[in-house]
Amino acid sequence: NVVLAPTMESRLNTLANFTASARRHGVPYRHMLFYGPPGTGKTLAARQMARYSGLEYAVLSGGDVAPLGNDAVTQLHSVFDWSESSSKGVLLFVDEADAFLRRRDTANVSEGVRAALNVMLSRTGGASKDFVLVLATNRPEDLDEALLDRVDEVLEFDLPGTAEREEMLRLFMKRYLTDPPSSSVGISGYFKGIKAQSDPVELDGISDGDIAEAAVDLNGLSGREVEKVVIAMQAAAYGSGDAKLTLDAFRNVVKTKIQEKSSKLAFVDIGDAAGAALSS
């Protein structure tokens, strides 16, 4: 389910194989930094690595840790204590790591965030045979230098190329359109055991060449955004009343999502300009 460039896939496979065998060989785990734009597969890759390697898996979100203030210290110590007592080993994934692991010389770092960073530094100061730390961020330049010194492997998750986007389109079109999987539904305990399955969508006049052309047109979109394009195609098909996706509807969704991407980038540029004006 993780579509990556061949070189990145090969490197991740090597690291996953090493992580799976590290305890057997009696060697320490290698801590990792995953960086790149949002939606490029950092979290999914970490989860897949944990499953493949047989490690237990824990997730911390920097956006959740930072507001805890001084309570973050207690929570972090609890996570590391559990990691060091696990019989299987633990992959500790820290998403949005820059939210509380940013450089200590930054002016707006609170005492609570500094304390949380100090816990991370003290608990990761030496090589570990108990846990592997995987940090994920969109802003690696904001991370504390001492924390970066703990990292053994740095992997850049870039936006997908044309070949990867085409593979994603085919993967997601199968998942959401032509062959949707069944799933258990259990909202608040109701309807447990009932199988829910989306109706398959008929592709009307959409060829392999059309999908390849769309992959080219979707340049600059992340994997998450490509998935959302296909979900929008699903909505268009069901909205037609007959669960059919025509070539015109397919192309209209692609065109609309490209325009939406341009609008979002414009919003970011306006926000950056406003922030720069306020700080000057």
Over which residues does each language-model region extend?
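C-terminal alpha-helical "lid" subdomain
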Residues: 78, 162-280
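Walker A/P-loop NTP-binding motif of AAA+ ATPase domains
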Residues: 1-205
